[in-house]
Amino acid sequence: MPLPLNQQNMKNIKTILCGLYTLVAIFFATSVSAQTQSYTHEGVTIKVQKIEIEVGAEKPFSVLHISDSHLVYADHRDTERKIKLAARRAKKMRNSEPIITAQRNYAIENNLPIVHTGDMMDFVSQANLDAAKRVFSKGDWIVATGNHEFSLYVGEAKEDDAYRAQSYDKVQAIYPNDLTFYSRVINGVNFVTLDNGYYKITKEQFSKMKAEVKKGLPIILACHNPLYTPGLCELIQKGDKTKPTGTVGAPFAVTEEYYHKERSAGEEWRNRNIQQRADKTTLKFHKWLQKQEELKGILCGHVHINSATQFSPTAKQYSVRAGFRGVCNLVHIK
């Protein structure tokens, strides 16, 4: 005998469906194992991995997705502290400019727009700004900003609006599009970028995203930090719930489990459960975005792994491995 559709039963049905959706999202979470080709430019070899997103484009086309290049330069124009920082960070990222140059050249040779999802620079320095300017001087770029774009010394202070403001203007002057929010249509597909590097979505960004949805075009969102999905959470944590996921919009029950320790007053921000905790606007944005049928895909970085996880009924989220590792994704859009 079917249950009467009263308010309580409807609530129970919705709870069951949400639970099933979460299980399906986790089941279909995958580490991307895509078709890969190699490309060499001036002695530097990169790997290009192919993925496909079906969105309903006016005609098929491709873009090159790169993230986390981490330029690591400093010179006499910077402080001694910054020069030492560059030397230390360069131990694992010293070839970042030759690699991003090879990736850019691949895009130019194949007439591909480049979608870069943040952390082009590892920290703000005059030498890094010059290097970023060289990189952006050629090619067709769509850029989202990462958390490192405005980092002065990498992890030395609380990252918030006031911290970002210290270097925002000089960074924005070098980059090819607005770093807070930007949109561009290619072959009937609306590419939207927004700054979520500090794990927050602002009310202004939320309002602008609603306006983009109202255009009625299929949307591919490009951002630095991945949006929370149960599948990506599983891939990153591998059963260890204390491991931070680096995702935006994670439920409080998830972030509260992240490893943290007692700190002195004013230093609590150093704990990931505080740093990555979503505010009300961010949680509301995340829930709202999952319901938007216009959203067809998300391109992101930050976590330095290749993955494809289900964000919503209409959109998968693709993270790409760190660009300084010589990896990028050729995204074919249909």
Q: Each predicted region: which residue ranges?
A:
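Short, Lys/Arg-enriched N-terminal segments with co-localized hydrophobic residues
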Residues: 1-9
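Bacterial N-terminal signal peptides that target proteins for export
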Residues: 9-21
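His/acidic metal-ligating clusters that form di-metal
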Residues: 102-113, 192, 199-307
